[in-house]
Amino acid sequence: MKDFFRRAPLPFTSSRREQQIPDNVWAKCANCGELTYQKQFNDALKVCPKCSYHSRISSREWIEVLADADSFVEYDADLQGIDILGFVSPKDNYEAKLAATSERTGTNDVVMSGSASIEGLPFEIAACNFEFMGGSMGSVFGEKVARAVERAADRGVPVLTINASGGARMHEGIFALMQMAKVSVALTRLARVRQPHISLLVDPCYGGVSASYASVADIILAEPGANIGFAGRRVIEQTIRQKLPPNFQTAEFFLEHGMIDAVVPRSDMRATIGRLLRLYQRPTSSADHREHVVAGHQ
């Protein structure tokens, strides 16, 4: 009996149930570290239920969040970048990097573009995926956005751009920089047919994108906490040798200084853009006009 109580403890082994828990059950907030069931996290559009941090989502996910079901028709999906400069780097080969990134993300470049609708209201959309080479703007990026704007002008509908970028793609040099002008020129044609450009700035939006077409819009929206600017915070502080305010280059800072029109939570984005599209709809008759005016006063 004495030896019975002195037995060595049995080695601990994890249960069969614990071994079968898949990796994607939990999602961890990148801001506060809160753990949330992945399904609950996805249902909340990847916004943390504790701190309301908006995690980055892909261009495809943005379209699923905003567009009516089965309304999105993609254009120019076959456009692919090429190494037009023969870019040489000791770290990577541009063509190989493009191929590897395409395989990982399932897209040929940063932008996914096409036609869609919100609440039955048609528009053109060009959405950026930051996961593709940091959302960098190259020839394919600019061409797809410009074509989306031109389709909007041809159809007489608004265009929505969702902008997340680190700036121009260094691998394409001047060909990347010229996309800033190309898209901005396309937007002048949209303005001539009196259709709006709605720009949504999401984290992060920097460089040539924020310095060109993303800021040339009739309505500029941003997500809470999105980092927006031209040069990064560290670069500016090193240049001016001063510390910047804690909220510098955030969406809230831009709103406070009149540089954007609204900061909109992701859960309200579809409804907000739907209201803007209705606002810009042209009444087709006097009866429609009266209905529009009455609805506006309700």
Swiss-Prot record:
Keywords of the record: ATP-binding, Cytoplasm, Fatty acid biosynthesis, Fatty acid metabolism, Lipid biosynthesis, Lipid metabolism, Metal-binding, Nucleotide-binding, Transferase, Zinc, Zinc-finger
Cofactor needs: Zn(2+)
GO biological process terms held by the UniProt record: fatty acid biosynthetic process; malonyl-CoA biosynthetic process
Pathway(s) it belongs to: Lipid metabolism; malonyl-CoA biosynthesis; malonyl-CoA from acetyl-CoA: step 1/1
Cofactor note: Binds 1 zinc ion per subunit.
E.C. numbers: 2.1.3.15
Stretches annotated zinc finger (C4-type): 29-51
Domain CoA carboxyltransferase N-terminal: 25-295
Catalytic activity annotation: N(6)-carboxybiotinyl-L-lysyl-[protein] + acetyl-CoA = N(6)-biotinyl-L-lysyl-[protein] + malonyl-CoA
Binding-site residues for Zn(2+), renumbered to this chain: 29, 32, 48, 51
Subcellular location: Cytoplasm
Family: Belongs to the AccD/PCCB family.
Name of the featured protein: Acetyl-coenzyme A carboxylase carboxyl transferase subunit beta
